[in-house]
Amino acid sequence: MKNQAWIKALFYIAFVYDAFLGVAFILFHDNLFAMFEVAPPNHPGYVQFPGALLIVFGMMYLQIAREPVRSCNLIPYGMLLKVAYCAIVFAYWFSSGIPGMWKPWAIADLVFLVLFGVAFMQLRKARA
């Protein structure tokens, strides 16, 4: 498929991004909360489980990057992850407030969401 290179690159970047954040929140959650001056939750599992989910989604993005046309049916699940995170962060950001540590990731996820949507539409056309 033409123009598939940017889609592969996008999902390789998404893999690295989500897997890196997942590992960071599993192994270095205390350091991250301290760095951003945010009180950590009362148990590390509240942060480690979402970190593990980020690694799982990262692996899915890696699969999409390797075989975009064949794996395009997975993209909506990645989009839903981005919608879920953005919806929660932006809702709190614009209503009652949220610590600044969460905001850059919401902006990045919004960009990923839009690009995933464009990639999905292109890949669906290629499969048709």
Segments predicted by a language model, with ranges:
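Membrane-water interface at the C-terminal end of transmembrane alpha helices
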Residues: 13, 111-128
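Membrane-helix boundary elements
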Residues: 4-45
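Membrane-embedded alpha-helical segments of multi-pass transporters/permeases
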Residues: 26, 62, 90, 114-120
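Non-cytosolic membrane-interface motifs at loop->transmembrane helix junctions
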Residues: 34-45, 73-74, 98-108
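Core segments of alpha-helical transmembrane spans in multipass integral membrane proteins
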Residues: 19-24, 42-65, 77-84
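Juxtamembrane helix-break-helix junctions at the cytosolic face
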Residues: 59-72, 93-94
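Residues within membrane-spanning alpha-helices of integral membrane proteins
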Residues: 8-18, 51-54, 75, 79-82, ...
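Membrane-helix boundary connector in multi-pass membrane proteins
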Residues: 66, 87-104, 121
